[in-house]
Amino acid sequence: MSNLPTKAKVVIIGGGIHGLSTAWKLSETYKNPGEIVVLEKKDTAAGASGIACGVVRNNYFQPAMRELMAHSVSVWESDPKAFKYNAVGYMQISPEIMHKDVASIYEQQKAIGYDSVFIEGEKDCSKYMKGIFDDWQAKGITSVLHEKKGGYAFNKDSIKALESKANSNGVNVHKGVKVTGFKRGSNSNAVTGVVTDKGTIECDQVVVGAGPWVRDFWNMLELPKTTEIKGQDGKMHEVDMWKYWFLQEGVLGVDANYLRTNEGKQPPVIHVDTDAPLHSDT
């Protein structure tokens, strides 16, 4: 969309999953067209959101995170066709060294009514997995946490669906617009506008949903470059506020019928941790 506006209620920076999901939900409050503006320097799903693995799961160790993820899974389930969401479930398959931690995750899932089953013991785990794949042969597995909800979504398609939902609610998404700074109030440090290479937008609120680029906006706002974190030694240590870790995820093209279950269905998303030796069969 061209013709950058000069005013908006909310300006959201970033056209990935954070920016667009925020725009979509805020559009339920700000219902007048043009009140919400999304700025994206390239294209929606051009950054990390477009290369993420797309797994939808609730396999997290923190209780608060688990409740949040249960809510998020329900959003994916609300429109699986648009989000290209495949509700095949998720499996955490682990050796004995992880048994206690995975059992804790299961108990927390059970406490919030999240549908999952937990299989314990090497013999029972092998039996359970062979009920899904009759050629299952992983050794040393003593726990299987099978989340019946969750699965996976196609990354770029799901982000484009968020863009479509936001657009339908009157959100304006402007692509090819680079944010270069912020405008402050005359008598305060409050941000009153977003400065771009295409002009300035006056606004009431700003949401920065820029993923790995958040550091740049942090610096534009002249916020602290370091913070203090308590170490294992009990002492406070000064560390950089932002540290960028580059994660690469590979995508393999396989036949659509590859790794089907015994019933010929799509398998759950499977995560296997193992301390057993790995051997090639080729």
Locations of the language-model features?
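Beta1/beta-strand and adjacent pyrophosphate-binding region of the FAD-binding site
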Residues: N3-H18, V37
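Helix-loop-beta segment of a Rossmann-like dinucleotide-binding subdomain
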Residues: P5-K7, K84-Q92, Y106-Q108, I112, ...
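Conserved Rossmann-like nucleotide-cofactor binding loop
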Residues: H18, T44, W213
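Flavin-dependent oxidoreductases
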Residues: S21, R57, F182-A190, T196-T282
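Short, well-ordered alpha-helices that flank and scaffold nucleotide-derived cofactor binding pockets
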Residues: W24, E28, S164, S168, ...
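Glycine-rich FAD pyrophosphate-binding loop
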Residues: S27-S49
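Dinucleotide-binding Rossmann-like beta1-alpha1 core, especially the glycine-rich loop
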Residues: C53-I132, I141
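A conserved beta-strand/loop element that lines the FAD pocket in flavoprotein oxidoreductases
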Residues: N167-T180
